[in-house]
UniProtKB/Swiss-Prot annotation:
Ranges where the record places region Disordered: 1-54
Gene Ontology, cellular component aspect: cytosolic large ribosomal subunit
Keyword presence, Nucleotide-binding: no
Encoding gene (name): rplO
GO biological process, one term: translation
Protein name in the entry: Large ribosomal subunit protein uL15
Summary of the function given for this chain in its UniProt record: Binds to the 23S rRNA.
Pfam families membership: Ribosomal_L27A (PF00828)
Skewed-composition ranges (Gly residues): 21-31, 42-52
Native source species: Bacillus velezensis (strain DSM 23117 / BGSC 10A6 / LMG 26770 / FZB42)
HAMAP family: Ribosomal_uL15
Compositionally biased spans, kind Basic and acidic residues: 1-13
Length: 146
């Protein structure tokens, strides 16, 4: 293969279709917009969700639920992520933040039981799932709620 034989891969370079540039182009005259009407006008067209005056789907369906103003958004950490710490470490929310395991403290930290913990650690968090507490204690560590 020589330099002058190189070709771009199939479909990687698509020519932009210029509309309204003479009828010989196949996209001239009305430029694919048809004749007259709202969609042929400049700035024409209907808003998203408009169904021609028929009651739109989003209005036909009932409203549902509410936003709980007392919701607490916990930073989630699975126990397999704790294997990155040295044996006997005291894992606190501040340490998790420093090491980049979590990006924000939010309302606190909740430890979940996905994965396997192989190290004996003292884990301090705001909440533990039942399986996470089991996993920490099975590895010989302690799970403390703060």
């Amino acid at each position: 293969m020589k330099l002058h034989e190189l070709k771009p891969s199939e479909g990687s370079r698509k020519v932009r279709n210029r509309v309204g540039r003479g009828i010989g182009s196949g996209n001239g005259k009305t430029a694919g917009k048809g004749h007259k009407g709202q969609n042929a006008r400049s700035g024409g067209g209907v808003r998203p969700g408009f169904e021609g005056g028929q009651m739109p789907l989003f209005q036909r369906l009932p409203k549902r639920g509410f936003t709980n103003i007392n919701r607490k958004d916990y930073a989630i950490v699975n126990v397999d992520k704790l294997n990155g710490f040295a044996e006997g470490t005291e894992v606190t929310p501040e340490l998790l933040l420093e090491t980049g395991v979590i990006s924000k403290l939010n309302a606190g930290v909740k430890i979940l039981g996905n994965g396997k913990l192989e190290k004996k650690l003292t884990v301090k968090a705001n909440k533990f799932s039942a399986s996470a507490k089991e996993a920490v204690e099975a590895a010989g560590g302690t799970a403390e709620v703060i």
